[in-house]
Amino acid sequence: KEFLLPLLKRNLKTVDDPFDVAKVFKSVRRNYFARSAIETAIFDAYAKSVHKPLYQLLGGNKDRIEGGISIGIKKTPKELIDTIKSYQKNGYRRIKVKIKPGFDLEYIKAVRNEFPEIELQVDANSAYTLDDIDLFEKLDNYDLALIEQPLGCEDIIDHAALQKKLKTPICLDESIDSLDDARQAIDIGALKIINIKVSRVGGLANAKAIHDYAKEHGVGVWCGSMLESGIGQAHNLAIASLENYRYSNDIMSSTCYLSDDIIKPQIEIGKDSFITIPEREGIGYDID
């Protein structure tokens, strides 16, 4: 209100479409969530003005995307297994499990023994260092789809060293705030997959730029969640329709975390783990 909107107003003559908003905000350091809030609203309004679904405006080629669930730290492996079973009943096929020291190898071994066929990911949220290489080499034996953010968010060089030791793909999340971050991580081999979060990178244009660069360099991406309301989730659905979003996404039913979402109809995941993207103009949902 005090800086970004006045900045945009002063530069309106340079804005021909929503992709130009990110260029106006490029001079602003960080403040990614605020920049994203403004830019994504403009994308929605513009898509409605040209009578297109947002996903088509972004260049998406999928009308449905696969969702997935992320499960936090549980007190025991049994509690984790029971939680996974409950989500499977609701249609979720891809399971991501949070890990940290003391809540890692025993838990993943138990989950893999109970569910030998599921798509299983682990997310460390920067809980480890390169000194934990023995643990990661053991996790390498459990057919994981990826290990997300094993080391600190600024440890790009150490991530590259770790990736060389593992067959399991490393996915970076907190380390990737911008196209420059993605470019550096890709160029030194610090990852094989990127988790793109629209709000964290400053909006849809930046998310698409990271997607495009990753695609050019053979690196797949998927869409992460910041526990958005339905409005944010709708933008996530739209960006996840792009071709190089190869993996199941942290996009889930509205009722997963909210008793009553602010959109209608609410987002629902099917029994096959897929979510259909609305064909209506803009984000495709009404505000309730």
What is the role of each PLM region?
Residues 38, 51, 95, 123, ...:
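Conserved, mostly hydrophobic/aromatic
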Residues 56-166:
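Metal-dependent enolase-superfamily TIM-barrel catalytic cores that perform enediolate-based chemistry
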Residues 1-50:
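Metal- or metallocofactor-binding catalytic centers and their adjacent structured scaffolds
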Residues 48-64, 267-269, 275-278:
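N-terminal amphipathic alpha-helix/helix-capping segment at the start of soluble metabolic enzymes
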Residues 96-98, 121, 146-148, 171, ...:
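Structured core elements
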Residues 5, 39-44, 109-112, 137, ...:
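Predominant activation on well-ordered alpha-helical scaffold segments within soluble catalytic domains
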Residues 40, 45, 97, 124, ...:
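Generic detector of well-ordered alpha-helical packing
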Residues 154-171, 176-274:
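Shared catalytic-loop signature of beta/alpha-barrel
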